[in-house]
Amino acid sequence: MELLQIQNVKKVYTTKLGLTQCVALKNISFTVQEGEFMAIMGASGSGKTTLLNIIASLDRPTAGQIFLNGTPFSSVRDRDLAKFRRENLGFVFQEFNLLDTFSIRDNILLPLVLSQVPVKEMEARLQPVAKMLDITTLLDKFPYEVSGGEKQRAAVARAVITDPQIILADEPTGALDSRSSVELLQNFARLNREVGCTILMVTHSAMAASYASRVLFIKDGEIFAQLYRGDGDNRAFFDRIVSNLSVLSEGGADVG
């Protein structure tokens, strides 16, 4: 089932005086299936972060439509956007965005507190998520007492505890060492495989993208190519991704 639909999305930024325009996205169209793990790649300035911000409802497109499970984003009033994001979207950022004055437990539960979920239900949701992400022993610690990889696992727990329709991850391995990056990506793959989480991840890393089932390449605000994993393993998919990135940098056609 198509969970997310991006239809002819265009984004144009105009200077205050209206003298200069910058086209960040040019008629982008694609869909994300429910239960899919998809990565978006592209060079700096390609438009991938702009696209993610629009999908996250943090920005509005100049033209085009976005639908989440059939609901057009354009129908959500500005004053209702925070509630819409909290109920439908989970976020994982490069810099964790945990509150240092809150324990790991309280950071994870914060979205549920804002939604006024009963305490018993919050605890019932927390335990299986903490167990899956191996952070049960960290719940009473504070962010400054744990490692970067552990912080990011807590951030993932915060993203999934609301049972969002889709998880949006922006360079989630960018602040992690190689070991923590692999652990995080394995957790993403497990959440996708065992829980059915739909994940859309923006990344510069071919290694990170190799954990996805599909990779979309963006260049100069347009879709350049896409790759499907198929039956190959991570290593084979990584090699194909690197080949496409090479062609992308040279401006050639999709090599498949």
Predicted segment positions?
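Short acidic DE-rich linear segments
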Residues: 255-256
